[in-house]
Amino acid sequence: MASIGGVRPFLLLCWVLLLASACATPAVPDAAPAVASLAPSAIGQGSTSATLPRMFQRTLQPGGMVAWTEQELRAIRSLSIAELPALPPDPSNRIADDSRAIELGRLIFFDTRFSVNRKISCATCHRPDLAFTDGLAKARGIGQTRRNTPGLIGVAWQTWFLWDGRRDSLWAQAVTPLEAPQEMGISRVEVVRTIASDADYRKRYEQLFGALPIETLDAEFPHRAGPFGDAVAATQWRSLADGIRRRINIAFANVGKSIAAFERTLAPAPGRFDRYAETLAKGGFGADSQLLDTDEVAGLRLFIDIDKTRCLNCHNGPLFTNHDFHNTGTGVRGSAGVDWGRIAGIADVWQDEFNCLGEYSDAARAACTALRFMPGSGQRHDVGAFKVPSLRNLSVTGPYMHDGRFATLEAVLEHYRSPAELNLALHELTPLDLTDTELKQLARFLHTLTERRFGPEERRMGKTSAGK
C-alpha cells in the first residue's frame, strides 16, 4: 500500500523508537539512575545530563543531590594535596636533606644574632603561627621594605624565589635578607664570625662542611665587610684578598644551604578541601556536607570553572600555583619607586654570584635547566609581572599581593572583578563576571585551603611553632 505524504514511514519510525525506549527501561522500576537531568541553573538553561558527553554528566549523590561531572572530579583531584609530588631534589645544595644541616638551619632561622641590631631573625618575618608570614602589608626588619612577606609552606617545590624570581634556589634566597639593609642588615663577614665564635655552631658547621675561615676571629680582621650594605662594609670587603673573599663566600653560602635545608621541611598539610577531595576520590558522599557547606561547594565549582572564572589558568596543581609570573594590574606605571617585577628579576638572577651556574653551587651545569633556559629580559609581559603565590593557608597569610595592598581576600576578588584603570595596556586580567553572592562563595571556598594547624585554637595554643 502506498504511503500518503510519507505518513506510513513516519508511523513506522515512531513504533521503532517506542520499542527501543521500552527495551531501555530498567528491570527494577525504583532503581536509582546512574545520571540524572540537571536543573537549568546547573549547566545551562534547558540542558540535561543525557544531552552531554559522559565526561560532562553529573552523577547523583544519595537523595538525588547533584554532584560532579567526571571532568570536574579530575580537576578537584588535581588540586588535592594527595597529588603533591615527592620533595624535589636541589642539585645545587648537596646537604639539602641532611638531618644535621636541617637542625643547623633551624637554629639559625630562629636566632636574632644574625641581624645588625641582634633583634631580628628569619622568624621575625616568617612566623610559624602565620604559615611563615608576618601579618603585615609590607615586611619590616631593620627598616621598612617595599614588599609583602611570602609564606614558606611548600617553598621547596618552587623554581624561582622572591616576588620577582631574582633567586633560583632556596639557599640563594636565604642569604639575601641577611645582607639586605632594610631586613637584617648584617654583612657576610659578621655572619661567618657569628658561626665561628659560637662553639655549638662551629662544631655543627665543621661536621658538615669542614674548617671555617677562622681568620675572621682575628682582632685585626675587618669586623663588618661585605659587597652590599653601607659604604664601610663595601670598602672593607674590597680590601680583602681574593682568596679570603672566596672562603668567606663559601661559608656564607653554606649558611644559606643550611637554612634552606630546614625550610625544605615546611611541607603543606591537608585542609578541609583536601579531606573533601579525598572523600570524592573514594566515591563517598555521606560526609561531604560535614566537610564543605553549600556555599563552599558553590565556590569550589566556580573556582574550577575554566570558562567563568579561569582561576585554574594560574592557580592550579596541589599548591594552587603555576609557579609563573603574571601582571595582574597591581603596578602603577610612572609612579615614584615603581616596582618593575619579573623583568628586573631576570636581570638580577643572572648577576647573582650564588645562582645555579655559579662557583658556589653544587650543581653540574646540565642540572641548571631553569636558569639556562630562562627567557631573556626585555619581554613585554614581564614588566610589572610578579610570581603567582600559592593559595594554601590564605586565611592567615594576608594582606595580599606583592605589596600587601589588599587587606582581605574579598578585596582581592573585587579587584579581579573590577581591575583599577592602571597599566591597562599590560595587565592580563579579564574582569570576573560574578555576582556579589558568587564572589562571597568563591572567597568561602578559598578559606577551606587553610590547614587545621593554623586555625584560631591551634595558633592560640602555640601548636605551630616549627621545631620549637
Give, region by region, the residue ranges found by the protein language model:
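N-terminal secretory signal peptides that target proteins for export/translocation
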Residues: M1-V7
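C-terminal motif of bacterial Sec signal peptides marking the signal peptidase cleavage site
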Residues: A20-A22
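Extended surface/linker regions that mediate inter-domain or inter-protein docking
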Residues: P62-A67, T194-N327, V332-R333, A364, ...
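Axial heme c-ligation environment in periplasmic c-type cytochrome domains
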Residues: P88-S92, L152, Q158-F209, A241-I248, ...
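C-terminal capping alpha-helices of c-type cytochrome domains
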Residues: R188-E215, N249-P270, D362-S377, G384-P389, ...
